[in-house]
């Protein structure tokens, strides 16, 4: 089944798709209505806040009826003179999938280099577009998405060799650096000084950064060291690092060229609890984002003067996203406030004032009234006594104890699920659902210690947290015990797979999106692109203790004879991270072993990868099926 082009696999997939069509035929009118609700959101036009870089302001816009954004620029002295940088609607013509990887403007501001994925498999092609003539030239393919200019050349990551390769517009190429450890991935980017290229080698446990200046040699910032992770920002007159060398929850450090030993770095003591998750620098000031118990705080500091001032703190269900500082008429910091129940707002801090001012915000659907919805944060005890947070959103009104509860989690790699307004949640919220994000161990919501307590030989904590929070919510009067549903994507799909085996009666409906469910077998295959890095997170099956632990929870291996709930699997044919065959054989095994009459379906996207379809209407179709499957599975009338 691994070879999806094998005739037997082709026939099997066709039968699976036919079965899906047959089973969902009675829901045709429900699906049509749900699609109509979801597609109504696509009429909203979206435009980003201009960012000043060099002599231009850059911004993007999605217009009504268009699938993709158009990226524009205009001279900062002539704001009405608009020029197209990249039109993704034009570039995507003739493809069933299109994703922009990254783009960068040349030092002379005459050419844009960009990478694109036209199949969903994660392989990107490097192309150049002349901004005066509009002529597009293809340079190289089978690349990672990141890129950076180095003089007249473009640096990109060659996937097959895991190398930084310098490409000239005429097609010549030179390998500058090759990463030999398969556990490490490479990325490149242009520094804030707009001259230096930053080359990062990173695994789940360590970082190593090199820089490349115009006409110079590769310079090592700090050699890789087990457990040391760091990020680098280079300005015109400074180098600033965010590092966990001195503090597990990260600290800022200032360094001089040649200081490759972190013990020589000058660390700044931020007198606040929590994790430093991001920062920006403008002139002598730093804007620092600190996260403590799910609350983000923005702190403005002058490290030379020892000055430190809190600017803003988020509430429940909110987060900050720092933006590149503005070099316009009123220079200063910019950031976004994201909320689960309010469209994104953008703010600016003019350094001379040291106060945040709202500059614009996204539009809400025409019939959306924020005051009708509520966000709550609860901290609930897991079975080992650890308090696990969950963020809930719902529409005000009926008693919460009588409502359907739909939970989600991720819980791996120290990654947090995004906190942002999503109008596609409204169909469920308006039908009375309580939606919840469970911030399980293994994720990054509460810092590195939270991540480490849910990885490797602590992985069971991730799954137990999810089950325990669901039970505690119902016990506290949130959610009807017979109307619980859950979803998870990728590593979050592992959570769903374990829950299906270990707590099959708790949730009536489960949704697993591109799920990682054959954990043990996948980690045993060294030919897969992510195996060497993933064993640092999940464990090494060549180590007996790790193999036993993995076997005891790996969803596919632990399918057993019992009554399973309704399960919808969403799979992508071109998924380069989690093979579609995992989901297919997992569902087949559940159907074979299940003693109940619940429905197990697989929804296969033919033209997408791990992150799903790029076509907005196809994304809504997938979402509509998910919502109707959950509604029908819970026995609700729609």
Where are these regions (language model features)?
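Extracellular/periplasmic ectodomains of large secreted or surface enzymes and adhesion receptors
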Residues: 302-305, 309, 323, 327-338, ...
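Active-site-proximal cap/loop segments of hydrolase catalytic domains
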Residues: 440-638
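Cap/lid segment of the alpha/beta-hydrolase catalytic domain
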Residues: 89-103, 115-121, 351-353, 360-485, ...
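C-terminal substrate/ligand-recognition segments
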Residues: 244-245, 275-293, 380-389, 433, ...
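Secondary-structure transition/capping motifs at alpha-helix termini
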Residues: 77-79, 119-121, 132-135, 215-216, ...
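Glycine-rich His-Gly loop
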Residues: 62, 338, 408-414, 490-493, ...
């Amino acid at each position: 089944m691994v070879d999806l082009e094998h005739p037997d696999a082709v026939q099997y997939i066709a039968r699976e798709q036919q079965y899906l069509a047959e089973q969902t035929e009675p829901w045709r009118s429900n699906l049509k209505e749900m699609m109509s609700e979801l597609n109504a959101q696509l009429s909203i036009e979206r435009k980003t806040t201009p960012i000043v870089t060099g002599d231009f302001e850059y911004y993007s816009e999605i217009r009504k009826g268009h699938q993709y954004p158009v990226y524009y620029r205009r001279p900062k002295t002539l704001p009405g003179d608009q020029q197209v940088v990249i039109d993704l609607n034009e570039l995507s013509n003739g493809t069933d999938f299109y994703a922009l990887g990254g783009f960068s403007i040349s030092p002379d501001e005459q050419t844009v280099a960009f990478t694109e994925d036209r199949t969903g498999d994660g392989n990107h092609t490097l192309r150049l577009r002349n901004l005066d003539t509009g002529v597009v030239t293809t340079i190289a393919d089978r690349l990672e998405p990141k890129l950076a200019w180095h003089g007249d050349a473009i640096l990109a990551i060659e996937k097959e060799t895991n190398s930084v390769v310098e490409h000239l517009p005429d097609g010549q190429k030179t390998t500058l650096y090759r990463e030999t450890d398969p556990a490490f991935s490479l990325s490149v980017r242009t520094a804030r000084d707009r001259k230096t290229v930053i080359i990062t080698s990173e695994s789940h446990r360590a970082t190593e950064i090199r820089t490349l200046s115009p006409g110079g040699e590769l310079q090592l910032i700090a050699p890789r060291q087990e457990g040391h992770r760091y990020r680098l920002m280079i300005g015109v007159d400074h180098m600033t690092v965010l590092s966990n060398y001195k503090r597990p929850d990260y600290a800022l450090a200032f360094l001089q060229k040649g200081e490759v030993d972190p013990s020589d770095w000058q660390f700044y003591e931020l007198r606040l609890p929590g994790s430093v998750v991001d920062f920006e620098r403008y002139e002598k000031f730093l804007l620092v984002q600190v996260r403590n118990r799910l609350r983000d705080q923005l702190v403005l500091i002058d490290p030379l003067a020892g000055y430190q001032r809190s600017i803003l703190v988020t509430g429940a269900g909110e987060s900050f996203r720092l933006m590149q500082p503005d070099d316009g008429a009123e220079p200063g910091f910019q950031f976004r406030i994201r909320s689960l129940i309010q469209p994104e707002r953008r703010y600016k801090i003019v350094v001379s004032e040291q106060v945040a001012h709202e500059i614009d915000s996204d539009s809400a659907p025409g019939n959306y009234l924020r005051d009708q919805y509520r966000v709550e944060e609860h901290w609930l005890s897991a079975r080992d006594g650890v308090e696990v947070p969950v963020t809930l959103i719902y529409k005000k009104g009926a008693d919460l104890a009588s409502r359907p509860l739909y939970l989600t989690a991720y819980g791996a790699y120290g990654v947090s699920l995004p906190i942002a307004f999503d109008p596609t949640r409204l169909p469920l919220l308006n039908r009375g659902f309580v939606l919840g994000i469970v911030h399980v161990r293994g994720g990054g919501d509460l810092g590195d210690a939270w991540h480490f307590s849910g990885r490797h030989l602590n992985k069971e904590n991730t799954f137990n947290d999810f089950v325990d929070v669901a039970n505690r919510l119902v016990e506290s009067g949130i959610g009807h015990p017979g109307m619980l549903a859950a979803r998870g994507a990728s590593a979050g799909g592992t959570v769903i797979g374990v829950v299906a085996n270990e707590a099959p009666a708790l949730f009536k409906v489960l949704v697993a999106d591109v799920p990682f469910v054959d954990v043990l077998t996948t980690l045993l295959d060294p030919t897969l692109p992510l195996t060497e890095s993933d064993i640092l997170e999940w464990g090494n099956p060549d180590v007996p203790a790790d193999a036993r632990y993995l076997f005891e929870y790996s969803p596919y291996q632990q399918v057993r004879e019992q009554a399973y709930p309704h399960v919808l699997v969403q799979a992508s044919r071109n998924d380069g991270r989690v093979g579609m065959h995992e989901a297919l054989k997992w569902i087949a095994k559940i159907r074979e072993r299940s003693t109940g009459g619940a429905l197990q379906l697989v929804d296969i996207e033919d033209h997408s990868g791990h992150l799903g379809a790029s076509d907005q209407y196809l994304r809504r179709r997938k979402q509509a099926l998910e919502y109707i499957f959950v509604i029908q599975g819970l026995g609700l009338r729609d």
